[in-house]
């Protein structure tokens, strides 16, 4: 049953990957317990929803990146925190950075696309994050430029997850040593702001936008 016509792409990314892991761990049963079948259907829909002219894909095929939301103008830009190359790599090979790396290996179709999406996302991390602070925006153009819509061109709540996604991709696949450069960069920035008290919202060049100290951001930085 459809609950909402405007899903955020990252939810489906986690659903598909969790189902692939369930299939590998417990095997496949009947109906909704055929985990691999359910995962493959999600992957196919994410990339081919628009094939019949009735919808919008969750991934932009030209740029090989997740859209912010598959509806209207929200499908014309991305969200760096939705980029999960470690998943895409697995999707490309599973027929086995980190989600896309998974999809590149485990999907039954579009494997080359998912492998290319992993590389596109790794490059996007470099393009979207500040070279001095390591901070990235909530929303971004496909070029990596900040998308300042509703103040989401700054480092706010979505952007907390970027560092964790970069770290997870490197932990799983170690495809790009730039990940360690970024980790050192962003952790040094927050350490200098007061490791026990740094604020939770910033401009990309390091101006504090909120004094609130959030355990969620601390957890992402610890990853």
Where are the regions that the model predicts?
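Aromatic-rich carbohydrate-recognition surfaces in CAZymes
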Residues: 2-27
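Extended ligand-binding clefts on enzyme/binding-domain cores
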Residues: 6-10, 33-220
